Amino acid sequence: GIGFLSRRYGLTVDDLLGADVVTADGRLLVVDDEHEPDLFWALRGGGGGLGVVTELRFRLHEVASITQGMLFFEPDAGLLAALVGHLSEAADELASMVNVMVAPPVPFLPPELHGRPVIMALLVRSGNPADGERLVGEVRDMAPTLLERVAQVPYTAVLGPFGFKGFGVVTGAGFADEFGPDRAARAVDAVTSGRQVVVNLRPMGGAIARVAPDATAFAHRDRRLMTVVSALAPDQATAELAAPAVDDLSAALSDGPYGYVNFLRALPDAAERAYPAATLQRLAAVKAAYDPGNLFRSR
């Protein structure tokens, strides 16, 4: 997936060295660059449905601790555009996501922020702690903060649960190559106007972009920003009512028809939205070769 170390080390699929896969006809295959290379290509970003993976072999990276910064700001469109621009050009070691949202009633936020529209910048800097403090400080200095938390923590601490569950959600996903004042204003207006939406913006680049688009089934290597719009509701049926508004806002914040497969809804055109035509054709060929009867299917 696309995580907090991706700008520095690449996507998770870029560190996959090999896999053992049971195919539809019962064979156990060793799959890597030299053995079953087409299947290995498809496993890296293809979304599944190709076999049963019984073992994965990954390249590992030693990460002792990271600098984590969680900074909350007033929901200002000019600041949002500046934040996204700054973080998109940051060093590869600094990963980030920027949320425009209504602060949820979770334990790690003080009660005075609960229910308040905010911009949240989540920063993760792997490597030298002093450099991490400096990079977080550059973001802190962009505007007065409502709340800030900066700490040295194990990388695993960044991946813990956020403490809220039991709600319905509908998402829209895209990629953007620019995020200027107009798009920032759309994002801020959507949240401050009372709609229960979260706009999530994730700078890409770095090591993600240093892999050829056709090297794996994830072809969107050169995109600058991943965008995710989510509508939250007490139950899924209520959330589904917001789907048209989610799709409209997602399209306004994105460039082109594509979105990150992990955040796309299971709609009839999901595959066409996740993969460019050439990638989708190659995936279909791999599927036909290894599972012609479509034994493995989720849709």
Predicted regions: what is each one?
Residues 1-299:
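Soluble FAD-dependent oxygen oxidases
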